[in-house]
């Protein structure tokens, strides 16, 4: 899980999800693409 100020989708399987006011990126193909804004 990377914590970044600006989250971007890194591949076509990445999805931007907002949970409890926190913007996250989840990816089904590569778990290294997981990100959280913070």
UniProtKB/Swiss-Prot annotation:
One of its GO terms (biological process) is translation. It comes from the Bacteria. Keywords: Ribonucleoprotein, Ribosomal protein. GO terms for cellular component: cytoplasm; ribonucleoprotein complex; ribosome. InterPro entries: Ribosomal_bL36, Ribosomal_bL36_sp. GO terms for molecular function: structural constituent of ribosome. The keyword Cell cycle does not apply. NCBIfam families: rpmJ_bact. PANTHER family: 50S RIBOSOMAL PROTEIN L36, CHLOROPLASTIC, LARGE RIBOSOMAL SUBUNIT PROTEIN BL36C. Belongs to the bacterial ribosomal protein bL36 family. This is Large ribosomal subunit protein bL36. It comes from Baumannia cicadellinicola subsp. Homalodisca coagulata.
